[in-house]
Amino acid sequence: MRIALYPGTFDPITLGHQEIIERGSFLCDRLYIGVAVGHHKKTLFSLSERCELVNGVLADLTLHCPVEVVPYCGLLATLYQKLHANILIRGLRSAGDFEYERQLFYANQHLNAQIETVFLLPAPQYSFISSTLVRELAQLNGALDGLVHDIVKKKLRLNSGGQ
């Protein structure tokens, strides 16, 4: 059985993330979306809010295998092993992402040589979208169309005082 793990902070989940999830679901028999606590980042949404948003978005996606959201804290390599995953899915938008992901790849290999990483490039219309950009636009009351799902947009607007 091919079990994949697509980890991230998803603060918030974007249309780019959604596309990677849909395409990733073709590659496996079961897909886990690992939502990280995000100790290294100050998150806008709590872990439970981020899991709720991911689950809400999943309901509207065309998925080709069962998908489950799993919150996690700690090492990605530990979660990978716990879930019996054999594919780690990561998205690459730019050369900067590649360099960061290359370092993570080697760190994960150091922790667990069994980790196989598959990198997916987003469609061009999603290649510039980041959760950071979305949070900044929301904070400044910028347009979020074409960046996030409507439920995410609504949550961002509520979080920024309904502006």
Swiss-Prot record:
Domain of life of the native organism: Bacteria
Binding, substrate: 9, 41, 76, 90
Amino-acid positions noted as binding ATP in the UniProt annotation, renumbered to this chain: 9-10, 17, 91-93, 101, 126-132
Gene3D superfamilies with a match to the protein in the record: HUPs
Catalytic activity: (R)-4'-phosphopantetheine + ATP + H(+) = 3'-dephospho-CoA + diphosphate
Subcellular locations according to the entry: Cytoplasm
GO BP field: coenzyme A biosynthetic process
Membrane spanning stretches: none
Keyword Disulfide bond: no
Alphabetical list of PANTHER family matching this protein: PHOSPHOPANTETHEINE ADENYLYLTRANSFERASE
The family this protein is said to belong to: Belongs to the bacterial CoaD family.
Name assigned to this protein: Phosphopantetheine adenylyltransferase
Organism, as annotated: Dichelobacter nodosus (strain VCS1703A)
